[in-house]
Amino acid sequence: MNTSAPLQNVPNATLLNMPPLHGGNSTSLQEGLRDFIHTATLVTCTFLLAIIFCLGSYGNFIVFLSFFDPSFRKFRTNFDFMILNLSFCDLFICGVTAPMFTFVLFFSSASSIPDSFCFTFHLTSSGFVIMSLKMVAVIALHRLRMVMGKQPNCTASFSCILLLTLLLWATSFTLATLATLRTNKSHLCLPMSSLMDGEGKAILSLYVVDFTFCVAVVSVSYIMIAQTLRKNAQVKKCPPVITVDASRPQPFMGASVKGNGDPIQCTMPALYRNQNYNKLQHSQTHGYTKNINQMPIPSASRLQLVSAINFSTAKDSKAVVTCVVIVLSVLVCCLPLGISLVQMVLSDNGSFILYQFELFGFTLIFFKSGLNPFIYSRNSAGLRRKVLWCLRYTGLGFLCCKQKTRLRAMGKGNLEINRNKSSHHETNSAYMLSPKPQRKFVDQACGPSHSKESAASPKVSAGHQPCGQSSSTPINTRIEPYYSIYNSSPSQQESGPANLPPVNSFGFASSYIAMHYYTTNDLMQEYDSTSAKQIPIPSV
């Protein structure tokens, strides 16, 4: 690999602005330092491009094929079509454009590269890069609109989403085609590197404005989402104080009722506005006003509510961390290329450092396309676990050692059954993230299990219906382990507190507040007086 010969023919690659050294070998020292820097840049970019080709192609291919799986044949929302387009753009960048860029790195002189290859590389890299950024910006605006509570009652139709997608494709590749056609014959086979004068500089300026606008939209949107989610988590930890008449104890379930019979609307953060929370609150408070003399809910259901609230708060914190990761990845991967493009617009003369910065910037922007499926996809957690599993066993293979695992039987029964239970709990992310319930509270909430312990105690509290759920399975394991902002939009079957089955039509927020303010033993005994056996009340 000859690193000095191509750079000498590059019009944008001049010598480093180094102070002159005493002696006749100052030029040789400069050339040696320049060759060392360029070699280090090539090694770093090649290593990152290998990671992009392997991990990025795998992740985007899995995400792209998931939309054509029979179980996901119908999109959850129309906006999922944007995720499909994003995965296609990133798959093309990681699988086709990144190997082409690797070829360009080792043959920097355009004299050794066919013109058709340079034209294809210019068009695909410029078009798909800006298209991927526009898709990410549109998804960020959609999620910000959803979190801020400005999502309309009816989602956008598929025709509107399709028109928006076609508009983004048209604008992106029109700009890329103009930039490719206006490229002068150069010794560099890099996009935007030859647009140095006349109309080429105007097209480069337009490309820089579009690139900068997309990066700014993504960064600002996810910063605002993170702030909203952080405030939402703080509100959940510190519930509002409501003045209650102590002379007349309020019922534990349902919303508090004013003198004129209207239920008090509990204020919630903006995250739940125009979502299923308001529907749940309205239906439950309305049901309470009609059925105020119903049976009080048992203590096990109150424990389930507390677990759901803690689970939702944990998801808020996890969503904040994800927003921070998205902002950092966008800034780190997009700023080097943006700085090099701005420098090309402002100055007519390039430099050797600018050329290295441009190479590293294109590598990082391709690396961002490799990271997208592990951040934006619906099954991003599963992809990350598989990659970590592969890296762990690859490292163990290099160290020539095996990881010894011992299977310990869980309770009584067949070893094969316990092995299946153990593997199910280790791979079920909802079980790992949800709070671990006690066995007796699960039996009290869902009826007797099929274990031997429950068979030995045939007495069951009155009012409980058996649901046939094993005691080893947690409550509500179908809760999705990630927040709705991780997906393109909230599903029609929302997860979290709104997805819990209402018991005797009680209000969610008022039950949560009542758990904090009505904890006296006399009141609890009055609520559980209908049970045949007193159920111990957990500390909240």
Curated annotation (Swiss-Prot):
G protein-coupled receptor that is activated by the chemokine CCL5/RANTES. Probably coupled to heterotrimeric Gq proteins, it stimulates inositol trisphosphate production and calcium mobilization upon activation. Together with CCL5/RANTES, may play a role in neuron survival through activation of a downstream signaling pathway involving the PI3, Akt and MAP kinases. CCL5/RANTES may also regulate insulin secretion by pancreatic islet cells through activation of this receptor. GO terms for molecular function: C-C chemokine receptor activity; G protein-coupled receptor activity. Residues 1-46, 108-120, 182-205, 340-350 are extracellular. It is found in: Cell membrane. It comes from Mus musculus. Glycans are attached at residues 2, 25, 184. The chain crosses the membrane at residues 47-67, 87-107, 121-141, 161-181, 206-226, 319-339, 351-371. Residues 68-86, 142-160, 227-318, 372-540 are cytoplasmic. Highly expressed in brain and heart. Also detected in skeletal muscle, liver and kidney. Also expressed by islet cells (at protein level). InterPro entries: GPCR_Rhodpsn, GPCR_Rhodpsn_7TM. This is Probable G-protein coupled receptor 75. Disulfide bonds: none annotated. Residues 443-475 are annotated as: Disordered. GO terms for cellular component: plasma membrane. Its main location: membrane. It is a multi-pass membrane protein. Belongs to the G-protein coupled receptor 1 family. Keywords: Cell membrane, G-protein coupled receptor, Glycoprotein, Membrane, Receptor, Transducer, Transmembrane, Transmembrane helix. The gene is Gpr75. GO terms for biological process: chemokine-mediated signaling pathway; G protein-coupled receptor signaling pathway.
